[in-house]
Curated annotation (Swiss-Prot):
Subunit annotation: Homodimer. Interacts with VP1. Interacts with VP2. Interacts with NSP2; this interaction leads to up-regulation of NSP5 hyperphosphorylation and formation of virus factories. Interacts with NSP6. Participates in the selective exclusion of host proteins from stress granules (SG) and P bodies (PB). Also participates in the sequestration of these remodeled organelles in viral factories.
Record-given protein name: Non-structural protein 5
InterPro entries reported for this sequence: Rotavirus_A/C_NSP5
Primary localisation category: host cell
Pfam family, one: Rota_NS26
Positions annotated to bind Mg(2+): 92
Gene Ontology CC annotations of this record: host cell cytoplasm
Region Disordered, annotated ranges: 17-36, 131-167
Cofactor(s) the protein needs: Mg(2+)
Length: 197
């Protein structure tokens, strides 16, 4: 992946930024930038009034203020210095060290002599496994196999006395043995179901 930074659309930045050759030309920042001193002078109300009265109302805008306090703004502005790209920025500016030029003291000059080159490599590997092991569901695991009940179908020879049906006894039944075995198995299955629940 390659990343390039395009700064040609920014105001007042020359296209020589991407050349690796030194240039003595400087490009001026658009608007008014202030090179401030770390030493603040005490606000001079008389000089501030003279400065503000010398400007028309249309000329006073946001660029005239570097602080919310107008007097502090003026003291910063009076300490501003025009900087040179070769000489650097003076932090201890004084009235004597200010260059005598036609350019105002609220301007900052700069030059960039080195190119900007940003390069980065991005390697990524994604592996997706779609193998799915079929697992037995919990229902299948929890299902218990109950004993299968097998009973032969009764034939027409099956006889049950109506008189004995009330007390649950079968006297004249030829399937009496099979009947009791089946009833015993049914009872066991019913008891197993009740225990599981």
């Amino acid at each position: 992946m390659s990343l390039s930074i395009d700064v040609t659309s920014l105001p007042s930045i020359s296209s020589s930024i991407f050349k690796n050759e030194s240039s003595s030309t400087t490009s001026t920042l658009s608007g008014k930038s202030i090179g401030r001193s770390e030493q603040y002078i005490s606000p001079d109300a008389e000089a501030f009034n003279k400065y503000m009265l010398s400007k028309s109302l249309e000329d006073i805008g946001p660029s005239d203020s570097a602080s919310n306090d107008p007097l502090t703004s003026f003291s910063i502005r009076s300490n501003a210095v025009k900087t040179n790209a070769d000489a650097g920025v003076s932090m201890d500016s004084s009235t004597q060290s200010r260059p005598s030029s036609n350019v105002g003291c609220d301007q900052l000059d700069f030059s960039l002599t080195k190119g900007v080159n940003v390069s980065a490599n991005l390697d990524s590997c994604i592996s997706i496994s779609t193998d799915h092991k079929k697992e037995k569901s919990k229902k299948d695991k929890s299902r218990k196999h109950y004993p299968r009940i097998e009973a032969d179908s009764d034939s027409e020879d099956y006889v049950l006395d109506d008189s004995d049906s009330d007390d649950g006894k079968c006297k004249n039944c030829k399937y009496k043995k099979k009947y009791f075995a089946l009833r015993m198995r049914m009872k066991r299955v019913a008891m197993q179901l009740i225990e599981d629940l």
